[in-house]
């Protein structure tokens, strides 16, 4: 066996190491490098062939020019929005697995379910928004319009599927993004050779569809259900470093790929009408162009909307800090996917929502109280209304009684009677009813039962019933300091009014929560309420609810024993009503605090009450936005504060009666506090002049705001907006000067009165700038401003003319001239520099370089325009710029969008231009797709995808003739363009579109029916169709004929006088005059005389109107799982098929077999004179006619006798039998020979086998003999040697 030659070592001939060796070798040989050789011997390096050099130069220039793209202005912001990466492919090809692996590669996190877009940080300056695209044609169209990069997954074991080619065609129409193919299922190939062939075949087919050299990535196999880490890492590096060219539609329109949706509709409106339009807020990164507030947007699959409000939020997936580093740390590897439930933090415009993982809302099962509350919430009318409309029948034959028939004496409110408790020494307030003395023990039990029932009924009553009860109670005991407390309630109610104009639903919720807190404070201040501590806990749990549970008098009587404890708990619970939103831990903590506070001394309670009063006084009174501040309101406010102070003093005196000693001088106590309160009352009574003149006084309360900010877990602060911001729109505009008696400024005396208020007016001598400058001594000589080029000359002395001084002052004052001079100087310097560069610079700059330089300058100007301003100011000027994370509020959204929301389908908000929201006539150039099997018919409804929209319309197809006529086509032509006109949304010219017959379900064949581009947007097009009018001649003269059957009246003939007519045979004519009889007949003149069999026709053109039908595709409003089943108007053929209506065929339109008569041609007759003149070869060869055979040469017919016929028949039968026997014998002989051949072959094989064995035996014996002979010869040789 020969050994294989080892592969020889090949020396490295390139690279830095080889270059060093070569240089060292040349130095050793004292030859030097190539540059030295060029200097030493330039002729050796001269041009050998000018033609070859020109060819190489042209080739290099061609290669350079091929790489050029038309430069565009770089409009990408400093913090660009995330790159949209669409992972597209057929079902079961590995899309979700690839997304999970990419997310794990970049963020080290694993997502269990991918729903909606997922935003991740992939590098120091790049973020990615990855979204999955299914095989629904609606989703494919929408994502192709916003994609920056498409990862097209291809099952290598199956090959290309139809969805791949459909998506490629969609991308070609709507602006071609970057496309990278990814081959999966490569581990299914067993043989490496087959794998290589498949890769090559798929790569070249992919290059045909995209462009030669398009990147095709290979994922070889899976390990534990995931792709290999190194391959995913390489794919991620390709995505991270990829460059993107801006697409025209995306850069000219703002758009948002929403990653979060929230319903802001009032729950009460939803409860009363579940089908009401919704108000939703959508969140996402703004891409494309700048977006202005209140602009028009289109949501594909839903419809057109106007932006109600837009605001920018902090970036939830911000780029890492701008510092030099080689890689990202673990904290900076962010992922943000709200629809997938990842991140845990949701950003709103005035709050940050943190997901605590369900630790604070754990509940084993829903209790019966929860079901009761839900049943109360679901009612559409209040219980009072139901009770008022209800009737009860006491007896079978009695009249039904209503609520108005019942005496209201039983519902009287209790009266208050103060009694001194001898055991405790405190004043107690007893509730006495009118019939208490008359009722007995049995009645008390019934009253207790009735009071319990009333308590249940009142527990479900609304606010209005409760306020009426409170008003009646205050009327009953006005003598016991109820008036002041009622004033306090009214004041707090006015403070807690809802704002007239809320910025958002969050403000409404906050205001409702404050109203709930105010009601709780009122309830806790009334001493007849029961168990104030429990009330505080329940109020803190359900702050802001519209209705509170009412209390019956019986409950108050039963709980009067614990009144002292409830009062102490109420005082401790009052300061805790700052926020109605608290958790269960906070509730238990408040209960513990209330128990601890019951043991406080009276002095501590007084100090706490003082602090509460001071806090309430320090807060500015909240006035509704529709209310104006005036002096009367100011006085009422101060009087209410005084009443509050007096009432609080009386309240403390009543509580401290049992603790103070009798006869003590109360006026000496707390003199410092009383003095402070008196000073405070004096300050409140003094009018605030600044507030009266300028309106609302905005003071700097940063320190107070910092103190009042609440912290959540020490991590986040609750961002509460300034309350005064909501009332700024309705406050007094102090910048507007209201003129009651305008001055006549044309009068000289009026102008002189304000002349000294302006710079150009006449000033006093000591204040006049010109005179002061004239008096200055000459300190400096002439000097020139090198920056602006202005020359300033010093004045010679104080006697210089005043005109020169005034001129110089004007030059210094005028900023426009200074700016223009500076600009001229800079232009002059720039031109000088360009001249210097053109003369002395060696590197020649091409036109392409100059164009790129201009684009870079424009990009720098665009960035520097608003660079120094903050975001809020920039938004007012240029709108919301791309890269911002914005929150958009949209009103009047169909309820199905919220109810049938599916996060797997993308929500895109596409901004519309000024005229793109209108609907009109659109003309376009269309071509039926070569892969679509059917042809398209005019007036058949079809779905177009133009711009952001997908809609159904009825187009008319036409073609332009050579004379400019737009002729209607019934069907689209094959393999060529035609025109199409339809009624639809206005779209800019040059926008691509595609047409689909249906978006419902999966069609078996290619779904894209046609593609094209928008041409024109006006109604000037006039589409006509051909109409042939036929008639018949009934009188024929020489060149004149009377024609009938073409028209119905003489008026129609008059309309067409002078029109050109023609016969089927081609004779042209003209219509002359109408005839009296028959009706519609006319006289016409022709080129030639007609025949009665001729048919006369006139070709006319009839204008066709374009159907005004526009139906947007609302696929996102369909239920979940049915979003790919949207169907609009059906075609005529579909309707016939659905209803089983067969088309009645027109007999004249049917194809009939062509019956042609066979023509018999006569023989060619050549005259004899011509035959003589013809040459011999062309002369007809005449042969003599065959004569009749003579009778003697004719053979007579043999007629056999019957006996002979029998013998002949017998011989035929015998010959047939003999031939049959011979055939059978031949077959048997063939079989015998075959068997004999087989036997001989078998014997031959056995013979060969025996011979082979015999040969082996002979050769073996012969070999043994030779070995023995060889051994014997070796032994003999050894013996001789010895």
UniProtKB/Swiss-Prot annotation:
Catalytic activity, EC: 3.6.5.-
Residue ranges, annotated region (G1): 89-96
Enzyme class: hydrolase
Name of encoding gene: BMS1
Subcellular location: Nucleus, Nucleolus
Composition bias, Basic residues: 1-24, 1249-1259
Region span, Disordered: 1-43, 397-557, 575-667, 787-822, 1178-1202, 1219-1282
Stretches assigned to coiled coil: none
Sequence ranges of Basic and acidic residues compositional bias: 653-667, 1228-1248
Superkingdom: Eukaryota
SUPFAM superfamilies: P-loop containing nucleoside triphosphate hydrolases
Entry's Gene Ontology BP terms: endonucleolytic cleavage of tricistronic rRNA transcript (SSU-rRNA, 5.8S rRNA, LSU-rRNA); maturation of SSU-rRNA from tricistronic rRNA transcript (SSU-rRNA, 5.8S rRNA, LSU-rRNA); ribosomal small subunit biogenesis
Protein name from the UniProt record: Ribosome biogenesis protein BMS1 homolog
Catalyzed chemical reaction(s): GTP + H2O = GDP + phosphate + H(+)
Gene Ontology MF term list: ATP binding; GTP binding; GTPase activity; RNA binding; U3 snoRNA binding
Region (G3): 132-135
Protein family: Belongs to the TRAFAC class translation factor GTPase superfamily. Bms1-like GTPase family. BMS1 subfamily.
UniProt KW keywords: ATP-binding, Disease variant, Ectodermal dysplasia, GTP-binding, Hydrolase, Isopeptide bond, Nucleotide-binding, Nucleus, Phosphoprotein, Ribosome biogenesis, Ubl conjugation
